UniProtKB/Swiss-Prot annotation:
Gene3D superfamilies: Hexapeptide repeat proteins (2.160.10.10), Malonyl-CoA ACP transacylase, ACP-binding (3.30.70.250). Pathway: Amino-acid biosynthesis; L-lysine biosynthesis via DAP pathway; LL-2,6-diaminopimelate from (S)-tetrahydrodipicolinate (acetylase route): step 1/3. Pfam families: DapH_N, Hexapep, Hexapep_2. This is 2,3,4,5-tetrahydropyridine-2,6-dicarboxylate N-acetyltransferase. One of its GO terms (biological process) is lysine biosynthetic process via diaminopimelate. Catalyzes the transfer of an acetyl group from acetyl-CoA to tetrahydrodipicolinate. The gene is dapH. Its EC number is 2.3.1.89. It catalyses: (S)-2,3,4,5-tetrahydrodipicolinate + acetyl-CoA + H2O = L-2-acetamido-6-oxoheptanedioate + CoA. The keyword Glycosyltransferase does not apply.
Length: 240
């Protein structure tokens, strides 16, 4: 998996068409209304649903007020530069409510839980779980077979573009409500205790805790047993 360069992301956002997509329920004498090809119209003679850019649909509503007697607008963004990731081809378990921007890479058999938020340029390795309400900022990178606990934050770095993003290496367990600041690398096999604030690199195969986080011991068999990654949670249905 390739991490996006910050300048690539900045250029993508700068050049992207800023959009305000809406979904509009309408009713009225709709056989008298003409809809342009740029608006998706699923209508019959009396009611229907429109999908499209707000500026275009508003023109339709204003110009046909004598035919459209009522409407309701659903709108969740304004001048948005980054679309949501198309999830249909992702070989991972992604639960309802996860917010995942375009240009995010998700490895096979990863798990993204409810209300996780993953920003552009983030990378999630094979078999890693991003738990409920966790936040992965821009370009944050998580290796293979990791667990990022509920409410944890991996700080994002898009600007300044020279800044180093958070890197979590393979087989890492990050506890609930941990904050990992930009530029930090969490070494392979490490464990970050719940609630820690990580301001410096974490050595491989160590346990860190506290604010700021400090090494409290090396990984031992007891720690391994308490932080075991369960592959059963990452299994998908056999492909048909």
């Amino acid at each position: 998996m390739k991490m996006m360069d910050a300048n690539e992301i900045i250029s993508f956002i700068q050049k992207s068409e800023k959009k305000t997509p809406v979904k509009v329920y309408i009713k009225g004498d709709l056989k008298e209304v003409t809809f342009p090809e740029t608006v998706q119209a699923f209508v019959n003679k009396k009611s229907g649903v429109l999908f499209g850019e707000w500026s275009e649909i508003k023109t339709i509503l204003d110009g046909n007020s004598k035919y459209i007697v009522d409407y309701v607008v659903e709108n969740d963004r304004r001048n948005s530069a980054i679309p949501m990731l198309d999830l249909k081809g992702i070989k991972a378990r992604i639960e309802p409510g996860a917010i995942i921007r375009d240009h995010v890479e998700i490895g096979d058999n990863a798990v993204i839980m409810m209300n996780a938020t993953i920003n552009i340029g983030a990378v999630i390795g094979e078999g890693s779980m991003i738990d409920m309400n966790a936040v992965l900022g821009g370009r944050a990178t998580v290796g293979k077979n990791c667990h990022v606990g509920a409410g944890a934050v991996l700080a994002g770095v898009i600007e300044p573009p020279s800044a180093k993003p958070v890197i979590v290496e393979d087989d890492v367990v990050i506890g609930a409500n941990v904050v990992v600041l930009e530029g930090v690398t969490v070494g392979k096999g490490a464990v970050v205790a719940a609630g820690a604030v990580v301001t410096e690199d974490v050595p491989p195969y160590t346990v860190v805790a506290g604010t700021p986080a400090r090494v409290i011991k090396e990984i031992d068999e007891k720690t391994k047993a308490k932080t075991e990654i369960k592959q059963e949670l990452r299994q998908l249905n056999p492909e048909k």
